[in-house]
Amino acid sequence: MVDAEFDRVAHDYETQHAAATRLSGEETEFFARYKVQDARHIAAAANCMPTRILDFGSGVGNSVAPLQGEFPTAELTCLDVSAASIDYSRHRNGDGPDYRTYDGHTLPDDLGLFDLVFTACVFHHIPADQHVGILRQLRTRLRPNGLLVLFEHNPWNPLTRHSVDSCPFDVNAVLIDGPEMRRRILAAGFAHCDLRYRLFFPRPLAALRPLERLLTALPLGAQYSLAAR
């Protein structure tokens, strides 16, 4: 994961993302909002009521407003390797969150502990041989009963493949399938990890989206979530 790679695209990220996801019929805000709503439902089902949240790989801050909306009383820390992305997020979202940068390898010692670590489509930008180590560090930053909620692109979905292949800032991305990502999470010391597939229907078929709750085990959704503790 190279900070300069995202420093170069920080101010054009949303335009590039919108172009890459146009086949879905949805705006960038939709993808951030659904993930955070899912995270809230997952946390509630796990009896986890976050007072401190880490947005790991927060980028240009697409998840900040949804996180503040769904968890209005929680303290939010945004952590990313790209200083330009963090600056853009601060300008866009204000000074409410604690904005931090790091070197892409070692989490800052003074981050503290969190009830929820949220990370959205970040690990496909991190070299695979670093995944377990970073996940292990994230685990050590969770409070008792804390929760990791991780979202990633599903490489088994052809539209996802097309979207990633056509996105300039994903040029060096290496997609990870759900079972493999789950193995890495467990290898990092998490005791339990729940895999669910999401985003089966594009906007023209949005009326069918209530059916998705019945399809979470079907490995054809455009993305997936992993909830671990």
Say what each PLM segment does.
Residues M1-A20:
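N-terminal, positively charged/glycine-rich alpha-helical extensions of SAM-dependent methyltransferases
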Residues F31-M49:
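Conserved alpha-helix/loop element of class I SAM-dependent methyltransferases that forms part
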Residues N62-T106:
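Class I SAM-dependent methyltransferase SAM/SAH-binding core
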Residues Y99, C193-R229:
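A C-terminal cap/extension of S-adenosyl-L-methionine-dependent methyltransferases
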Residues F118:
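A conserved beta-strand element that flanks and buttresses the S-adenosyl-L-methionine
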Residues V132-P144:
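A short glycine-rich, Lys/Arg-flanked "PGG" loop and its adjoining helix->strand segment in the class I
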Residues N145-E152:
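Conserved beta-strand signature within the Rossmann-like core of class I S-adenosyl-L-methionine
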Residues V164-E180:
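Acceptor-substrate binding/catalytic loop of class I
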